[in-house]
């Protein structure tokens, strides 16, 4: 089954990057995402499945951010998640929409320019809830959790502004839908992760507090998963573009090191 259905070029001024909006098959649905392919002189077969944060229009995939990763030699694919930007279905915040992440990985595997053993997954914020199961269900080269949610019970308690969204997408509050909160929390998958993991988190993050990173690190360590933890001091959920790019270079360097070890 070929997952690619359509590929529409998006305007980008530099010849070094080809940016397109892709329509692809995810189960029975047609969903969308952004693909950035760096020039042949920059790339070496490595790829990143970038799993965005937010919900619907909040936290939508940004071209400039994807170019940062692509400039470091990676073909990047970032699903928008179902129900967004003309994609079919409904975004469930880590429910059936997980298939959009799995199929995004498969789409990269089907790309002849990609080495199937060198596909890395990055989950930012809510993307952490998408990235951990992807690392369990697909042969990822590595997993990066950046400012990522690891505990859905915590997310419900910490973010009163997200209560309504979580009650809708998780079919109720934790006391009613305990099982759903459990199975969607990356913490409960730590023992199933096979790939090396790097965790990057800002100490002053108020959207996803740093305790998510500390608990995730502990669960992975106890489970015997190779894991590194980097805390970014005096920064919040979003940082300056310059600092963001410095950390992006760092995490991509780590990804390349994992490939050498494979």
What are these regions (language model features)?
Residues 2-41:
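N-terminal cap/lid segment of alpha/beta-hydrolase-fold proteins
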Residues 41-45, 50-89, 153:
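Short substrate-entry loop that stabilizes the transition state in hydrolases
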Residues 92-112:
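Alpha/beta-hydrolase active-site loop
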Residues 114-125:
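Alpha/beta-hydrolase fold nucleophile elbow
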Residues 144-154:
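Active-site nucleophile loop of the alpha/beta-hydrolase fold
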Residues 153-189, 195:
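Mobile cap/lid helix-loop segments that gate and shape the active-site cleft of serine hydrolases
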Residues 193, 199-201, 205:
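Short beta-strand/loop motif that positions the catalytic acidic residue
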Residues 214, 221-262:
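C-terminal catalytic histidine-bearing segment of alpha/beta-hydrolase fold enzymes
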């Amino acid at each position: 089954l070929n997952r690619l259905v359509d590929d529409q070029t998006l305007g980008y001024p530099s010849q070094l990057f080809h940016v397109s909006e892709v329509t692809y098959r995810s189960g029975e649905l047609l969903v969308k995402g952004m693909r950035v392919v760096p020039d042949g002189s920059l790339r070496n077969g490595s790829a990143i499945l970038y799993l965005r944060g937010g919900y619907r229009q909040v936290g939508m995939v940004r071209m400039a951010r994807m170019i940062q990763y692509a400039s470091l030699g990676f073909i990047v694919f970032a699903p928008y998640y179902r129900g967004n930007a003309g994609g079919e279905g409904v975004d469930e915040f880590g429910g059936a929409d997980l298939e959009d992440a799995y199929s995004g990985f498969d789409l990269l595997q089907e790309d002849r320019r990609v080495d199937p053993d060198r596909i890395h997954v990055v989950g930012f914020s809510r993307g952490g809830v998408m990235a951990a199961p992807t690392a369990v269900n697909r042969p990822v080269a590595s997993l990066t959790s950046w400012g990522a949610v690891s505990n859905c019970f915590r997310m419900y308690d910490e973010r009163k502004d997200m209560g309504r969204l979580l009650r809708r997408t998780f079919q109720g509050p934790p006391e009613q839908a305990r099982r759903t909160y459990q199975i969607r929390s990356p913490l409960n998958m730590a023992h199933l992760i096979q790939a090396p993991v790097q965790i990057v988190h800002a100490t002053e993050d108020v959207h996803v507090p740093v305790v998510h990173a500390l608990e995730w690190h502990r669960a992975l360590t106890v489970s015997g998963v190779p894991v590194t933890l980097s805390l970014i001091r005096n920064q919040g959920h979003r940082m300056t573009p310059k600092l963001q790019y410095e950390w992006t270079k760092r995490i991509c360097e780590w990804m390349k090191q994992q490939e050498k070890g494979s």
